[in-house]
UniProtKB/Swiss-Prot annotation:
Stated consequence of mutating residue 319 to P: No effect on catalytic activity
One GO term (biological process): carboxylic acid metabolic process
Practical application: Yeast engineered to express TYDC mutant Y350F together with Pseudomonas putida DDC (PpDDC), Beta vulgaris L-tyrosine hydroxylase (BvTyH) and Papaver somniferum (S)-norcoclaurine synthase (PsNCS) accumulates (S)-norcoclaurine, an important precursor for the production of benzylisoquinoline alkaloids (BIA).
Record flagged with keyword DNA damage: no
GO MF annotation: an example: pyridoxal phosphate binding
Keyword Manganese listed: no
Binding residue positions for L-tyrosine: 100, 205, 320, 350
Protein's name according to its UniProt entry: Tyrosine decarboxylase
């Protein structure tokens, strides 16, 4: 039982080389580096958005895995011919969609080191360097953001706070919501979970809805509080307080507020300080989601957007968005790490060890959902060391400058308007009704619907060209085109060229 047949030596003869042979690793590794270097050199020439149809790859690849080994040369040929056509090129300098996934040499090489070591750092003992480097780089980045010391690790352990690298914002919100949930249920009884209420704005990322669902929050108790143009779609503290008071009146228990610095739709900023002041009156856990815009806050001129963070309970940003660190790398800081650990810890016999029992080390398995974890801190460490604070600020400012340039180009064409104020490096614009309807415009739903339809048509036309790629959002009933600068290879000439593409397609649609 469980033994290999003695008369079948096929598996031994087919692949005599060890899968981790150092010389072969060096040979193939150089080929991959050269392949990717050529890709980055030529990525500008590809259609930015993939032009394939659903199911294209199934028609190109075999129905089953190969029985015999294939060479890396053959595999890379297939990557070129079959995989690259199906990629949307997030590293293209003409990529302006969603939010950036900015890469860098340091981030890529850090990922190589992390993957090469292939350690599983669930606790300190399993790889001390992985744990300790993570706590160090989280303090470094926290200091760059001038986060209060209550969010950082202290040498004497007095602060109670600290940072951890999660995969995504979804995970960060789920972990903090779970900690807040258990902390509250320990006070009011676990049978009252259906009374817990979560608050956010109608602009908050859908990650909160997913986290609440997983954490067992009653879907009816997730409040997406309406925002308006009057506050640039930021969450009003008065609206928050009204919602809280209504829930208390109904016998519900306010639990958690997710405030956002740089919403996905329009980069709106919720007023952290005033919102925290309201939340603290009712014992609500406040999480600050700065997934996109948090990176910019290492620049002094943007730091004010997170003023008031000292009164929050947790704060997160995605280094894989706008901080030149490859996916995935979400940085989460908490003030009360004990609440996080109590909600998420497990201690099976096979993981017990003297280091953990000494209480002198961090076991990051207890700061996240999963047990296993990657050596994410390696790539962030390389990014911080390879570029330094000064250069990272310069990179971020260059993207903001290019967004301002694009905004200026829009301002010179009276057919267009900026829908919401530009705050960081994203511009939200649209064709104006007056450019579409020659007669005098009156405010009515028909005109707005038709304007939205023409803007939909414009964006689809631009993206189908493959020259640039942008995405859209709808705020306050207005369909707008989002132009997000942040790809590492983007230069001002690409921004200028993108505007020319928009104008050309506008001319074609309007018959100019």
């Amino acid at each position: 039982m469980g033994s290999l047949p003695t008369n079948n030596l096929e598996s031994i003869s087919l692949c005599s080389q060890n899968p981790l042979d150092p010389d072969e690793f060096r040979r193939q590794g150089h080929m991959i580096i050269d392949f990717l270097a050529d890709y980055y050199k030529n990525v500008e020439k590809y259609p930015v958005r993939s032009q394939v149809e659903p199911g294209y790859l199934k028609k190109r690849l075999p129905e089953s895995a190969p029985y015999n080994p294939e060479s890396i040369e053959t595999i890379l040929e297939d990557v070129t011919n079959d995989i690259i056509p199906g990629l949307t090129h997030w590293q293209s300098p003409n990529y302006f969609a969603y939010f950036p996934s900015s890469g860098s040499i340091a981030g890529f090489l850090g990922e190589m080191l992390s993957t090469g070591f292939n350690v599983v750092g669930f606790n300190w003992m399993s790889s001390p360097a992985a744990t300790e480097l993570e706590s160090i780089v989280m303090n470094w980045l926290g200091q760059m953001l001038t986060l209060p010391k209550s969010f950082l690790f202290s040498s004497d352990g007095s602060s109670g706070g600290g940072g951890v690298l999660q995969g995504t914002t979804c995970e960060a919100i789920l972990c903090t919501l779970t900690a807040a949930r258990d902390k509250m249920l320990n006070k009011i009884g676990r049978e009252n979970i259906n009374k817990l209420v979560v608050y956010a704005s109608d602009q908050t990322h859908c990650a909160l809805q997913k986290a609440a669902q997983i954490a067992g929050i009653n879907p009816k108790n997730v409040r997406a509080i309406k925002t308006s143009k009057a506050t640039n779609f930021g969450l009003s503290p008065n609206s928050l307080q009204s919602a809280i008071l209504a829930d208390i009146e109904s016998g519900l228990v306010p639990l958690f507020l997710c405030a956002t610095v740089g919403t996905t739709s329009s980069t709106a900023v919720d007023p952290i300080g005033p919102l925290c002041a309201v939340a603290k009156l009712y014992g609500i856990w406040v999480h600050i989601d700065a997934a996109y815009a948090g990176s910019a806050c290492i620049c002094p001129e943007f730091r004010h957007f997170i003023d008031g963070v000292e009164d929050a309970d947790s704060f997160s940003l995605n280094a894989h968005k706008w901080f030149f660190t490859t996916l995935d790398c979400c940085c989460l800081w908490v003030k009360d790490s004990d609440s996080l650990v109590k909600a998420l810890s497990t201690s099976p016999e096979y993981l017990k060890n003297k280091a953990t029992e000494s209480k002198q080390v961090i076991d990051y398995k207890d700061w996240q959902i999963a047990l296993s974890r990657r050596f994410r801190s390696m790539k962030l460490w390389l990014v911080l060391r390879s570029y330094g604070v000064a250069n990272l600020r310069t990179f971020l400012r260059s993207h903001v400058k290019m967004a301002k340039h694009f905004q200026g180009l829009i301002g010179m064409d009276n057919r267009f308007e900026i829908v919401v104020p530009r705050t960081f490096a994203m511009v939200c614009f649209r064709l104006k009704p007056t450019a579409i309807f020659k007669q005098k415009i009156v405010d009515n739903d028909y005109i707005e619907d038709q304007t939205n339809e023409v803007n939909v048509k414009l964006l689809e036309s631009v993206n189908a060209s493959g020259k640039i790629y942008m995405t859209h959002a709808v705020v306050g009933g207005v369909y707008m085109i989002r132009f997000a600068v942040g790809a590492t290879l983007t230069e001002e000439r690409h921004v200028t060229g993108a505007w020319k593409v928009v104008q050309e397609h506008t001319d074609a649609i309007l018959g100019a």
